[in-house]
Amino acid sequence: MSETSYNGWPASKDRLAIGIKSYTVPGTTVKLACAEKVAPLLIGFAEEFHKLIEPIDGSNDDWGYCYRMVRGSTDKLSNHSSGTALDLNAGSHALGKIGTFDAAKVPMIRALAKKYGLKWGGDYINRKDEMHFEIALDAAKVATLITKLELDNA
């Protein structure tokens, strides 16, 4: 049986087995590793986040793919394990901290996340994770959204 992250996407320690590639976020020197099938959404989101929310500073606190469990779990694979999640400016938005973004930017963060089919860790019910953004759609809906946003050739 193959592994999946908790959002249902294929996960593996073998990056190539699940189509993990590195992509440069336009307008930055930051490279993020993510699943090829979701890359247009994650990288498109990161580009707009950089322009509209805050610069992705490139200080080695921006991540994508990483095979691991959810922090604090022993049996729940993180969405990073499937290359379907990003952490942006983690040094400024630590796990468990609340209110790390300018309050005026929060509605824009939510709108951008929705536009790109993502769930924002700042909206988690329990432990907040304001640096974290993850794919909240299945493969068919991801493909449809990529076409709708005209990211097919991105």
Positions of predicted regions on the chain:
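Active-site acidic/histidine clusters and adjacent loop/turn architecture
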Residues: 1-55
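Intrinsically disordered, low-complexity N-terminal regions enriched in serine/proline/glycine
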Residues: 5, 64-66, 115
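Solvent-exposed, flexible loop/coil residues
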Residues: 10-13, 27, 36, 69-74, ...
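Short secondary-structure junctions
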Residues: 13, 51-58, 116-123
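Active-site-adjacent loop/helix surface patches within enzyme catalytic domains
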Residues: 40-84, 92
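Catalytic cores and adjacent binding grooves of peptidoglycan-active enzymes
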Residues: 73, 77-86, 90-154
